[in-house]
A protein has these predicted regions:
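Residue-level marker for the onset of beta-strands and adjacent loop->beta junctions
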Residues: 18-20, 29, 102, 127, ...
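Glycine-rich, histidine-containing beta strand-loop boundary motifs that form or position
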Residues: 16, 35, 58, 120, ...
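Residue-level recognition of beta-strand termini and adjacent short loop/turns
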Residues: 4, 16, 111, 146-148, ...
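Acidic/polar loop-and-plug regions of large Gram-negative outer-membrane beta-barrel proteins
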Residues: 123, 127, 140-208, 212-236
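Short intrinsically disordered, low-complexity coil segments enriched in acidic
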Residues: 1-7, 119, 192-193, 236
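Acidic, small-polar-rich N-terminal luminal/periplasmic segments of exported/outer-membrane proteins
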Residues: 1-85
């Protein structure tokens, strides 16, 4: 949210309670997402627990790589193991509605040419809206090894398990939200459901040719199982 909020020309839009939806320079997209440069266009909410930085490109995608939308693209760069470093970090967050979030980031040095990193998170979703709840789990182990002084291999696996209540918001009248219904959900608590389970394998070989040139080869294998159903009020 904050990443997009403070990026000029980029806004969020309604993702119908189950997916990221970004507006690049007035063009709405649910598919122009990338992870480590590889396309990630499955419709779901992406977590940032294992993300080092987010890159946002604005302008026609065809100018860069041929396929995609006309407004721009969003690329998430994942955290990689750091050679020669041992570190551990954990955080816990709670709010007044009873929601909580737990994250951990472990980096382990395994010798001069190898390191291992594990990122994991678990959160429980709650807010002021009727029936709203959800649970999300994710973990991402990554192994890095130096094949030579200029070549590095990263092997990564990520597992995602996400279930949440679908809240499509409140109805409108005269092109405005009906504020009196701020806490009321116009839906079916047993029918408004979204689930996604995913396994993502990634392999990346990076090579430094010179001080000004480097290249990488990435291979990704993804398996997603998603279910989405809901009822909602269109108007009042």
């Amino acid at each position: 949210g904050d990443i997009i909020r403070y990026t000029p020309g980029v806004n969020t839009s309604q993702g119908e309670g189950h997916r990221d939806a970004v507006v690049f320079r007035g063009v709405r997209s649910t598919a122009d997402f990338f992870q480590d440069g590889a396309r990630d266009d499955v419709q779901y909410y992406r977590s940032l627990y294992n993300i080092e930085q987010v890159e946002i490109l604005r302008g026609p995608n065809a100018l860069l790589f041929g396929r995609g939308g006309t407004g721009g693209a969003l690329n998430r760069v994942t955290k990689k193991p750091r050679l020669g470093v041992d570190s551990r970090k954990a955080s816990i967050g709670v709010d007044t509605f009873g929601a909580f979030d737990i994250e951990a980031d472990l980096n382990m040095d395994m010798g001069d040419d190898m390191a291992f990193r594990l990122n994991l998170h678990s959160d429980s979703l709650k807010n002021h809206r009727d029936f709203y709840d959800g649970d999300r789990l994710g973990f991402n182990p990554t192994l890095r090894t130096k094949l030579s002084s200029a070549t590095t291999l990263d092997l990564s696996y990520e597992y995602i398990d996400h279930e949440r209540f679908i809240d499509r918001g409140i109805p409108t009248a005269n092109n405005k939200p009906v504020e009196e219904f701020a806490e009321i959900v116009f839906g079916d608590k047993d029918n408004n459901v979204h689930t996604v389970e995913a396994s993502v394998f990634r392999a990346m070989v990076s090579h430094v040719f010179s001080e000004t040139r480097k290249g990488n080869l990435s291979i990704t294998s993804n398996s997603f199982e998603k279910m989405y159903q809901n009822t909602y009020a269109a108007s009042h």
